């Protein structure tokens, strides 16, 4: 049984990373920014898994678990900041975060 070629998996990971990067740079809503970060982290995790599967090493899967753990921590902290931003300024615009000083 053969899997997908490594080039296809890495191309998919690169496309997902670029989509996340564009979403990160274009959007001003903090919720969409967090979602774009998650897409980028999942793309990196996919690249680790594809590379690990190519050489038959479990290191890619271990890195995937670490990336998922990091993504969960990032999401929880980001959502906590999002809630505080919305409660204080009644908006999800990232430009309002500059007013949080003081």
From Swiss-Prot:
Entry GO CC: NADH dehydrogenase complex; plasma membrane
InterPro entries to which the protein is assigned, alphabetical: NADH_UbQ_OxRdtase_chain4L/K, NUOK/Mnh_C1-like
Keywords, sorted A to Z: Cell inner membrane, Cell membrane, Membrane, NAD, Quinone, Translocase, Transmembrane, Transmembrane helix, Transport, Ubiquinone
Origin superkingdom: Bacteria
Gene3D superfamilies listed in its UniProt record: 1.10.287.3510
Keyword Coiled coil: no
Main subcellular location: membrane
Protein family (similarity comment): Belongs to the complex I subunit 4L family.
Task performed by this protein: NDH-1 shuttles electrons from NADH, via FMN and iron-sulfur (Fe-S) centers, to quinones in the respiratory chain. The immediate electron acceptor for the enzyme in this species is believed to be ubiquinone. Couples the redox reaction to proton translocation (for every two electrons transferred, four hydrogen ions are translocated across the cytoplasmic membrane), and thus conserves the redox energy in a proton gradient.
Protein name (record): NADH-quinone oxidoreductase subunit K
Species of provenance: Ectopseudomonas mendocina (strain ymp)
Gene that specifies this protein: nuoK
